[in-house]
A protein has these predicted regions:
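Alpha-helical scaffolding within the catalytic cores
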Residues: 263-270, 325-326, 350, 357-368, ...
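Loop/turn elements at helix/coil->beta-strand transitions in domains of secreted/extracellular proteins
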Residues: 6, 277-279, 308-315, 332-337, ...
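Substrate-binding clefts and catalytic carboxylate motifs of secreted carbohydrate-active enzymes
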Residues: 49, 56-63, 70, 75-76, ...
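The substrate-binding groove and active-site-proximal loops of carbohydrate-active enzymes
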Residues: 51-57, 157-158, 256-257, 285-298, ...
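Aromatic-lined substrate-binding rim segments of carbohydrate-active enzymes
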Residues: 1, 304-307, 313-355, 400, ...
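Secreted/periplasmic carbohydrate-active enzymes, especially glycoside hydrolases
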Residues: 1-290, 294-314, 518, 528-534
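Active-site region of glycoside hydrolase catalytic domains
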Residues: 79, 83, 97-98, 105, ...
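Short, solvent-exposed turn/loop segments enriched in Gly/Ser/Thr/Pro and often Arg
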Residues: 14-16, 40, 187-194, 284-288, ...
Length: 543
């Protein structure tokens, strides 16, 4: 770095080693595979090779899609701060703060300073001293700093359960000469997560637990072992492919943060709780925030407003495709809990990453970057399946160490969950009530055609009618159910209920009625069984 002249910052962008070859969907050859070789390079935007909901993105979203910042600092630096809010539940009239941060001394001599934490009128000071080139982890609780307490805090709640109050907080290093050496600014939502779920021990049968990670994970060790999972005998409803499982409990029942409870109605299914209150999760999956990674606040905020106005309270970040700070900021502001996947998809179909260590380093960086967001409620290893045993153990250890405030689950649909799907149109909407509704379901949906105005945004007018290969390129579904494809079932149902269409506008108008009927039935079916084993339902897809 030359401080007296202009400096040039060069950024080299490398293509993925395994970009794969997208399948060009058409009527004759069908929808093609979901993803492909790009999964080997994980973590990547695996859907950009093409999926059954998105054509291939030609450059696989290579390049820079967020701001790049160059920071000039002093010899003492604050690194990777984590603030945990600990409520003495069920009491919410006070909160204790747990502040963890690394501090790095890049100088060649010992340095001292005072570490200041400020939030909502609370101010705590702690002296630090670091040797030359030392990086030190500092963890402060109310035991070390009695000031790390607040009375009558304003809480953060999911949409529909209360407000989304966010405190401005800062962590500063102040020298003996009162100079500010470094400062980290954050927005903190005061809330505490708990989970009701089932697990098993060596001898007793499956047990039902109330699990509080903030209490249970302060030793930095996992509470559950997903590799030693047990399959449950639950044949109550349609379940997708791989069955239903519960994890092995690594810590004794009634140890800190793990409490035995009695609840036969919820079976083994997960219930998410915020501030001691059960949250009935309603929302949808985001496959990608934007296909071309145009991810400004101006582009994303209307989607979050829509979710809030639809009374949703959860977004699933499917395979971690939404990667920017503003996504989580908006989820904080609009009260959307986030089920955050990592970059793995369907076990037995999608390829596993070639480099587990690279994958876990990216997990570590992702968790450290976003863990202060109150909206994140759940970390998840894989969409539709389990990670390999080696990678699963690495992930579980990493999450317990890096984020002792949230649950980590090893599977999006089969672990303390009731499966995923189906994704086909149901002519008889009552089927959702009779045969499907219940549990915590990470995906369920139906083909869903947008308005004619939207169709004309991505098709030339001459291609909009009749249905042609241009429709199939844009994923007019060719998945089969029995002798018919998803798109045939959808169109047939529309024709039977509302009559055949002979132009795009009429077809899309009728589609909105069919879409409304289907999605209303899905949500009402889950609502009808709330806490009578139903705890959450996420549409495929809501964005």
């Amino acid at each position: 770095m030359d401080y007296d002249k202009k400096n040039l910052l060069a950024i080299r962008i490398l293509p993925p080693n395994n970009p794969g070859i997208p399948h060009e969907a058409n009527r004759k050859e069908g929808i093609g595979p979901n993803g492909g070789a790009l999964c080997l390079d994980g973590p990547t935007f695996i859907s950009s090779e093409g999926w059954d909901w998105i054509p291939g993105i030609r450059d696989r979203n290579m390049g820079i899609w967020q701001d790049v910042r160059v920071k000039f600092g002093n010899e003492l630096e604050i690194v990777d701060t984590h603030v945990i809010t600990d409520l003495p539940l069920p009491d919410t009239t006070s909160v204790n703060f747990i502040v963890q941060t690394e501090i790095y001394n890049s100088s060649k001599t010992t340095r001292t300073a005072n570490l200041h934490f400020n939030i909502g009128g609370v101010s705590a000071v702690y002296p630090v001293s670091l040797n030359a080139n030392e990086k030190k982890m500092i963890k402060l609780t109310s035991n070390e700093c009695k000031e790390l307490q607040m009375k009558n805090p304003r809480l953060w709640w999911p949409n529909g359960y209360g407000g989304q109050y966010l405190y401005d907080a800062s962590l500063s290093l102040i020298s003996s000469g009162k100079d500010t050496l470094d400062v980290k600014k954050m927005r903190i939502g005061i809330r505490e997560l708990e989970y009701e779920l089932s697990a098993y021990e060596d001898n007793p049968p499956i047990v039902r637990l109330n699990y509080n990670p903030t209490a249970a994970l302060q030793d930095g060790k996992p509470a559950f072992d997903t590799v030693k999972r047990k399959k449950t005998d639950n044949k109550v409803r349609y379940t997708n492919y791989d069955g239903e499982f519960v994890p092995y409990l690594l810590k004794p029942v009634s140890s800190q943060g793990i409490e035995l409870i009695k609840d036969s109605l919820m079976k083994e299914y997960m219930v998410i709780k915020v501030n001691g209150q059960r949250i009935f999760c309603k929302g949808g999956n985001w496959g990608m925030d934007d296909g071309m990674k145009r991810v400004s606040r101006e582009r994303l905020e209307p989607a979050l407003k829509l979710h809030k106005n639809m009374n949703y309270n959860m977004i699933r970040n499917w395979t971690g495709e939404s990667t920017e700070e503003v996504f989580y900021e908006l989820c904080d502001e609009y009260g959307m809990l986030v089920m955050n996947d990592f970059w793995l998809s369907t076990d037995g179909f999608n390829l596993n990453p070639l480099d587990n260590c690279l994958f876990v380093r990216n997990v570590t960086e992702t968790v450290r970057r976003f863990r202060n967001h109150p909206s994140i409620a759940l970390w998840c290893a894989r969409n539709e399946g389990f990670a390999t045993n080696e990678l699963e153990y690495m992930l579980a250890a990493t999450l317990a160490k890096e984020d002792g405030s949230r649950h980590y689950t090893g599977n999006s649909r089969s672990l303390n969950s009731s499966g995923s799907g189906p994704w086909r149109y149901q002519f008889d909407a009552g089927w959702y009530y009779r045969s499907l509704a219940g549990g915590f379901r990470s995906e369920v949906g139906t083909p869903s055609l947008p308005t004619a105005e939207t169709v004309r945004e991505f098709m030339a007018e001459e291609d909009t009618w009749p249905i042609s290969d241009v429709w199939y390129y844009h994923d007019w579904h060719n998945h089969r159910y029995g002798s018919k494809t998803f798109s045939e079932l959808y169109k047939e149902g529309m024709d039977r209920k509302l009559g055949p269409s002979d132009n795009l506008d009429d077809f899309c108008r009728k589609a909105q009625l069919i879409n409304y009927e289907s999605h209303r039935a899905i949500f009402e079916a889950w609502n009808s069984k709330m806490w009578n084993d139903a705890s959450g339902e996420l549409l495929w897809m809501s964005h």
